[in-house]
């Protein structure tokens, strides 16, 4: 009977040792996974910052292009409005009046 209990004890000790080994291996794997997760988060933050910087740069370029377009449109409208200005109309009217007056003489 004593041999039976000795065998059972040895068997249980072997199982405990196997469980310890498995536990240590799992702990190592968990540590590796935690490290990988940490590195992934760091890389994700870096990529987010790069994306934000790129978005800001694109926004600045778009704002500059919009401002240039508005300035160009304003320049065009000021040139087109030359015909609508009252001073220009007066000068043209006076010039035509003078031309008509000289052409009748």
Swiss-Prot record:
Membrane spanning segments where?
Answer: 82-99
Where is the protein situated, by its record's location annotation?
Membrane
Q: Does the keyword Transmembrane apply?
A: yes
* InterPro entries membership: NEAP1-4
Q: Where is this motif: Bipartite nuclear localization signal?
A: 8-29
Q: Which organism is it from?
A: Arabidopsis thaliana
PANTHER family for the chain:
NUCLEAR ENVELOPE-ASSOCIATED PROTEIN 1 (PTHR48145), NUCLEAR ENVELOPE-ASSOCIATED PROTEIN 3 (PTHR48145:SF3)
Which Gene Ontology cellular component terms are annotated? membrane
Signal sequence, start to end: none
Main subcellular localisation:
membrane
Q: Which gene encodes it?
A: NEAP4
- The answer to keyword Phosphoprotein applying to this record is no
What topology does the record note for this protein and the membrane?
Single-pass membrane protein
Keyword list (alphabetical) reads: Membrane, Transmembrane, Transmembrane helix
What's the protein called, per UniProt? Putative nuclear envelope-associated protein 4
